[in-house]
């Protein structure tokens, strides 16, 4: 139990450090602006898609109720009325106008994709037609799937077997649908492998945070009525902006939780200087080169199990940028130059690493081939730098 509690505390700390370091608040602000510009286009596209299917007639109201009742506090009702008015007017747009709405919606999809993949630290992005198809799938399939789920739930609710459970369904079904939507988002958007159960855990946490935020935001709006004195009839607009920003912050926090569930590990007892670790990684690649083979990420994780996966990936990214390594398909890596001609001095010079001191250079392994040359380098450096900072001849009287 104590070990799990220690892991949980370390994991929460990791999530919030990542949230701050990756400037997630700025991402949420950018997505809020994109969201506000694309809100009417998104609703127009969704309504148009559902109108294509006769069986979804009347489901549009239920979809809006699901979104506005479960993802927004009560103040969103005024915004919903105005949005419906704008959507009804947009139905009279020409083909060019409708195309503009679709492009605006796709730009929001692009912002979401870039933000989530930035939080996941994915080295590559979707390109060309794959990117367009992915965005179009997110844009078109989401409203259709939500409408289909609501239509199915309405049908099952009328069955005699489940009629007694209608109260539970009314409360639990929207929450389940939101969890599934977040799970799909956390699995599909990152351009990397995401485990379903970890995406589901992150989605449940995000949905719970949404419920708590919705409750707290409703209290905030009720208690602080000074907004109405300042903004008057347009009070709903700044409040809606604030809520959308809070919503994106929570959603991106869920992305970091999902990322952390894949990458986070409790700190190992063994501490090693980064330059020593990099040299050992390159030494392992030289051994693989002698066997004319590449190394997978799993092999590297197994060999350097005392390193966090995130730390190991960071070293690999640095070695890729310095042209020591080349990345192959399927997260395979190989040495980009002749290993036996590589020297410690070249690695140190090209990477601009900090040289470990003699205490840091010492390893638990008795036959560490790096300790002796690093100790000698430190001694030579100490001898060369053993000069007075300001000599008496250079001091101006």
Swiss-Prot record:
Q: Which InterPro entries match?
A: UPF0761_bac (IPR023679), Virul_fac_BrkB (IPR017039)
PANTHER family the UniProt entry points to: INNER MEMBRANE PROTEIN YHJD, UPF0761 MEMBRANE PROTEIN YIHY
- Topology with regard to the membrane? Multi-pass membrane protein
The portions of this protein that span the membrane are: 36-56, 92-112, 132-152, 168-188, 201-221, 237-257
Which GO CC annotations does the UniProt entry carry?
plasma membrane
Instruction: Name the HAMAP family on file.
Output: UPF0761
Query: What is the protein name stated in its UniProt record?
Result: UPF0761 membrane protein Kkor_1635
Query: Which cysteines share a disulfide bond?
Result: none
Q: Which UniProt keywords apply?
A: Cell inner membrane, Cell membrane, Membrane, Transmembrane, Transmembrane helix
Database matches in Pfam families: Virul_fac_BrkB
Q: Where in the cell is it found?
A: Cell inner membrane
Q: Which family would the database say this protein is a member of? A: Belongs to the UPF0761 family.
Organism listed in the record = Kangiella koreensis (strain DSM 16069 / JCM 12317 / KCTC 12182 / SW-125)
């Amino acid at each position: 139990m104590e070990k799990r509690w220690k892991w949980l505390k370390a994991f929460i700390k990791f999530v919030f450090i990542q949230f701050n370091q990756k400037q997630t608040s700025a991402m949420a602000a950018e997505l809020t602006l994109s969201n506000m510009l694309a809100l009417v286009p998104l609703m127009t596209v969704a309504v148009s898609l559902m109108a294509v299917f006769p069986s979804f007639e009347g489901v549009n109201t239920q979809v809006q109720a699901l979104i506005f009742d479960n993802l927004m506090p009560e103040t969103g009702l005024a915004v919903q009325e105005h949005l419906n008015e704008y959507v009804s007017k947009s139905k009279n747009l020409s083909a060019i106008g409708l195309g503009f709405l679709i492009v605006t919606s796709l730009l929001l999809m692009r912002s979401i994709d870039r933000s989530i993949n930035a939080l996941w630290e994915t080295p590559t992005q979707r390109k060309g037609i794959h990117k367009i198809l992915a965005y179009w799938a997110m844009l078109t399939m989401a409203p259709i799937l939500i409408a289909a789920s609501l239509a199915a739930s309405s049908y099952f609710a009328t069955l005699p077997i489940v009629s007694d459970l209608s109260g539970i369904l009314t409360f639990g079904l929207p929450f389940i649908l939101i969890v599934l939507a977040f799970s799909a988002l956390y699995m599909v958007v990152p351009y990397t492998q995401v485990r379903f159960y970890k995406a589901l855990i992150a989605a449940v946490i995000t949905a719970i945070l949404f419920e708590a935020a919705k409750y707290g935001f409703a209290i905030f709006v009720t208690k602080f009525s000074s907004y109405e004195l300042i903004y008057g009839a347009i009070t709903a607009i700044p409040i809606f902006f604030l809520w959308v920003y809070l919503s994106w912050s929570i959603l991106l926090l869920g992305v970091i939780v999902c990322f952390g569930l894949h990458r986070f590990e409790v700190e190992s007892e063994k501490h090693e200087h980064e330059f020593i670790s990099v040299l050992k990684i390159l030494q392992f690649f030289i051994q693989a080169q002698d066997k004319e083979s590449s190394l997978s990420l799993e092999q590297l994780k197994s060999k350097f199990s005392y390193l966090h996966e995130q730390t190991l990936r960071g070293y690999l990214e640095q070695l890729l940028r310095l042209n020591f390594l080349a990345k192959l398909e399927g997260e395979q890596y190989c040495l980009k130059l002749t290993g036996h001609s590589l020297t410690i001095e070249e690695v140190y010079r090209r990477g601009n690493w900090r040289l470990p001191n003699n205490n840091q250079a010492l390893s638990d392994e008795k036959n560490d081939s790096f300790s002796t040359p690093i100790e000698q380098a430190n001694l030579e450096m100490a001898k060369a730098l053993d000069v007075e900072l300001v000599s008496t001849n250079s001091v101006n009287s």
